[in-house]
From Swiss-Prot:
Forms oligomers. Disulfide bonds: none annotated. Belongs to the MraZ family. Pfam families: MraZ. The lineage of its organism: Bacteria, Pseudomonadati, Pseudomonadota, Gammaproteobacteria, Pasteurellales. One of its GO terms (cellular component) is nucleoid. HAMAP family: MraZ. GO terms for molecular function: DNA-binding transcription factor activity; transcription cis-regulatory region binding. Residues 5-52, 81-124 form the SpoVT-AbrB domain. This is Transcriptional regulator MraZ. The keyword Transmembrane helix does not apply.
Length: 152
């Protein structure tokens, strides 16, 4: 399970180092294999261990090619999906199209979301967190039926 936000740097070759606390799980369960794709709702990337990505692929494959919205989701998520392998230094290479989508430069935030990571530019991450905190302070979370039942 991946939790917490880590500041990491993007090197000149487009690689980021996965924090050491996550590497054993990625190596043991997935032999270092991961898949990175775009988030269609946010200017960030989604990085899945291979076993978790395979679950997503199964869900995407069940969508209809004849429904325009479902086909669009398949096209974007599968079209951008790129296999990434953890190298001996614990780094993954993020392809240029993925870096461009998320506006990645040197300062990156790697954010654990239990079964995956989100990869954000530091500036986009800060802007998103401000929006999320403002939304939380406004009480709008309580308007969601599922969230109104959540006790933290």
């Amino acid at each position: 399970m991946f939790r917490g936000a880590s500041a990491v740097n993007l090197d000149s070759k487009g690689r980021i180092a996965i924090p050491t606390r996550y590497r054993p799980e990625i190596l043991e369960i997935n032999q270092g294999q991961m898949v990175c794709t775009v988030d269609i709702r946010q200017p960030c990337l989604l990085l899945y261990p291979l076993n978790q990505w395979e679950i997503i692929e199964q869900k995407l494959s069940k969508l209809s090619n004849f429904n325009p919205e479902e086909r669009s989701l398949q096209r974007v998520m599968l079209g951008y999906a790129t296999e990434c392998e953890l190298d001996s230094a614990g780094r993954i290479l993020i392809s240029a199209p993925l870096r461009q989508h998320a506006k990645l430069e040197k300062s990156i935030m790697l954010v654990g979301q239990l079964n995956k990571f989100e990869i954000w530019s530091e500036s986009e991450w800060q802007a998103q967190i401000e929006k999320d905190m403002t939304l939380g302070a406004s009480g709008q979370f309580a308007m969601s039926e599922a969230l109104s039942m959540l006790s933290l």
